[in-house]
Regions:
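RNA-contacting regions in translation and RNA-metabolism proteins
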Residues: 1-141
Length: 141
């Protein structure tokens, strides 16, 4: 697992969201139109809030789409969490240590959505997998 370097902008988002929702936010990826927060295991329900009210609060505050992902010490479960809400059929980890390659098999109807426009979704998944686990690359099958 590599050392996590968080930008000043991401730190501000983490601080504001964490204080507002009273949860532990471990990481944040800032994209053009969205924020992806990694929350401590067991705090996903609190982060989203009843009927998604906390998501809506943050959307209004930051004027960006918000996604929460639950952290997990198991690489496969963490990758599965990153891929939600898409239908993941299988996740395999080839290799060990910092050279591990994760291969995700998804339902064909979800493949393009998981990759995202211009590869934006898969790039975020790669970044977070590398930051939180010893993963070299993430591939979609």
């Amino acid at each position: 697992m590599s050392e996590i370097m968080i930008s000043k902008e991401a730190m501000q988002y983490i601080h504001m969201a964490g204080n507002l929702l009273k949860i532990d936010i471990l990481d944040c990826i800032v994209s053009n139109d969205r924020l992806v927060f990694i929350v401590r295991k067991g705090q996903l329900g609190i982060a989203i809030g009843s009927k998604g009210k906390n998501l809506e609060k943050l959307r209004n505050l930051f004027k960006k789409n918000i996604k929460f992902v639950e952290s997990d010490s198991d690489t496969k479960r963490f990758i599965h969490n990153l891929c939600k809400p898409y239908s993941v059929k299988d996740i395999s980890v080839d290799g060990e240590g910092s050279g591990a390659v994760v291969k995700i098999q998804v339902d064909p109807s979800d493949k393009s959505k998981l990759i995202g426009r211009g590869g934006s979704n898969i790039e975020i998944i790669r970044q977070l997998a590398q930051r939180h686990h010893s993963v070299k690359d993430v591939q979609i099958k």
